C-alpha cells in the first residue's frame, strides 16, 4: 500500500474474511430488459438503463462542493440530489425521529443537465433515506457523499456526515463513495479533483464494490490537477482530538449556565506511517480508503468464545 497506484482489484475478500468464499461483488443496479415493441418503449427503456446516481452532502445544499460534484458526475447518468437545507457537519450516521420535509430546490447554474434537486430538513442520512423512499424511481446504481469542504481522513471519518451518506448507501445495498477536498474555504477550487472524481465513479459504476464496502476519497488542496502526485490506496491513520472543549467567555444562557464550544486540534499518532491516508494527503497524494460497515472485531471472536464458555487457552480480555 506504500506505493502509488491506480485502482487495484476491489473484488478481493476483506482481509478479516475467513470463510471459504469471497465476499460477493456488488454490481451497479440495472433495470430488467423487457421485449421492446415501439419507439416510445425503446426510448423509455434507454432512459431506465441510464445509471441512477443519488448525491447528498453534509455542508448543505447551497455549498459549492455539491454543485461541483453534480457538474462532474451528471454526464455519467441521471442524478437525484437530496441534501440538507443547511450545514449538518459532524452528524455521522445520525437520523431523525422528528418530522421531516422535502422541498424542491432550484438547480444552481452550471450544475449539469439531467438532475433533480431536493432539500431536506434532516441529517445527511435522513436525506438518503428520504430519497430512497420518495424520490428514486428505482434502486440507484451509485450513492455519493460530498464533495466535502475539508478532509474526512483518519479517525475523523467516524464523525463525518459525508461518510454517513456512503455508509447508509452500503447498508441499502448500493455501491457508495464519499469525496472530500482538503480545503475549508466556501469558495474552494474543486476543478483539480474533477478527473479523479470521474475515474472513481466510472470504476464503481462499471465494476461495483465488495458487499458492505464503500470508498472514502480524500484529495489534497492543489493549484492544478498536475500538482496531485498520484493516487494511493491507504488505511485509516490513527489519531485524536486534544483540548476539545473551550469556554466561551461571558456567554451565559438564560438559565445561568456557562456555554462551551468544541474546538481543539487534531494529532496524527503515526505521522511516519507511509501506508496511511494522513501521510498520503500530507505528501500530495489522493487517498482512497476502502471502509466497511462490518464493525466486527474478528480477531476477538475466538478469545471471547473462550471467555463465555470457560474454555480455551486464553480467557483474558487484555
Describe each region flagged by the PLM.
Residues 49-56, 64-139:
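A cross-family phosphate/adenosyl-ligand binding-site feature
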Residues 131-137, 164-175:
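Alpha-helix C-terminal capping segments
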Residues 15-18, 30:
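Short hydrophobic alpha-helical segments enriched in small aliphatic residues
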Amino acid at each position: 500500500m506504500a506505493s502509488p497506484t491506480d485502482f487495484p482489484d476491489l473484488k478481493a475478500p476483506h482481509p478479516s474474511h475467513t470463510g471459504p468464499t469471497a465476499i460477493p461483488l456488488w454490481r451497479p443496479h440495472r433495470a430488467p430488459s423487457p421485449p421492446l415493441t415501439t419507439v416510445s418503449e425503446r426510448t423509455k427503456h434507454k432512459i431506465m438503463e441510464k445509471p441512477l446516481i443519488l448525491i447528498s452532502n453534509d455542508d448543505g445544499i447551497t455549498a459549492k462542493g455539491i454543485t461541483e460534484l453534480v457538474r462532474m458526475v451528471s454526464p455519467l447518468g441521471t442524478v437525484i440530489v437530496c441534501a440538507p437545507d443547511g450545514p449538518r457537519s459532524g452528524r455521522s450516521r445520525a437520523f431523525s425521529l422528528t418530522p421531516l420535509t422535502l422541498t424542491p430546490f432550484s438547480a444552481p447554474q452550471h450544475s449539469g443537465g439531467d438532475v433533480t434537486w431536493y432539500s431536506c430538513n434532516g441529517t445527511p442520512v435522513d436525506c438518503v433515506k428520504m430519497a430512497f423512499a420518495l424520490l428514486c424511481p428505482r434502486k440507484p446504481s451509485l450513492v455519493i457523499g460530498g464533495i466535502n469542504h475539508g478532509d474526512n481522513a483518519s479517525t475523523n471519518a467516524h464523525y463525518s456526515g459525508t461518510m454517513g451518506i456512503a455508509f447508509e448507501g452500503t447498508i441499502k445495498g448500493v455501491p457508495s463513495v464519499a469525496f472530500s477536498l482538503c480545503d475549508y474555504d466556501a469558495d474552494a477550487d474543486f476543478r483539480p479533483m474533477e478527473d479523479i472524481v470521474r475515474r472513481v465513479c466510472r470504476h464503481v459504476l462499471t465494476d461495483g464494490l465488495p458487499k458492505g464496502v464503500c470508498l472514502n476519497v480524500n484529495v489534497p488542496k492543489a493549484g492544478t490537477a498536475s500538482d496531485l502526485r498520484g493516487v494511493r490506496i491507504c488505511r485509516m491513520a490513527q489519531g485524536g482530538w486534544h483540548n476539545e472543549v473551550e469556554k466561551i467567555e461571558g456567554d451565559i444562557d438564560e438559565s445561568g449556565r456557562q456555554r462551551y464550544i468544541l474546538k481543539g486540534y487534531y494529532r496524527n499518532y503515526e505521522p511516519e506511517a507511509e501506508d496511511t491516508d494522513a501521510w498520503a494527503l500530507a505528501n500530495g497524494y489522493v487517498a482512497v480508503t476502502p471502509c466497511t460497515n462490518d464493525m466486527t472485531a474478528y480477531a476477538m471472536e475466538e478469545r471471547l468464545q473462550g471467555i463465555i464458555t470457560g474454555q480455551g487457552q486464553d480467557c483474558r480480555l487484555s
